Amino acid sequence: MILYHGSTMEVSQPRILKSEIGRDFGFAFYTTDIQAQAERWARRRAMIESRRTKTEIQAIVSVYEWDDSAAKHLQFLQFDGVSMEWLELVVTCRSRTDYSHGYDIVEGKIANDNVGETVSYVMQGIMRKEDAIERLRFEKINNQIAFCTETALRTLYFQNSYICGSVNP
């Protein structure tokens, strides 16, 4: 299976960054099987970095081959859609930096800006989880695959990278 990672640099050797707090499935290396989504991620990161550094920044997508058959030998959690279990994991991972779910790989929907707003309402106690699930059923939500352990990263093979855009300050 081909996977993509959007960034501002080529990522030939993926790593799990412990500095990225508040991610949907906790500390992990995040990919997607949707090329256009990875390109949006890359352009968004380039825009943020360009504003911060006041320099031109390239948006780069790294491409990987994933040996998904190896997932059979790993702790693999897959969500087919929005569910109570998915929401509870996202809320827990976003609100508790010390939380470790124990999975090598987690695949599921990504909490984009609209979804993130709903998740934050749940985290703040403004919205019940049941109401959030109902609201999220109508959202078009993209996919993400999070590689949460070094063992999981060894099933990911870098193929190439390409520039999908450039952002000026």
Regions found by a protein language model. Give the residues of each.
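Alpha-helical interaction segments
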Residues: 15, 19, 31, 54-55, ...
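Conserved NAD+-utilizing ADP-ribose enzyme module
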Residues: 23-24, 40, 44-169
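Glycine-rich loop/turn
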Residues: 1-29, 37-47
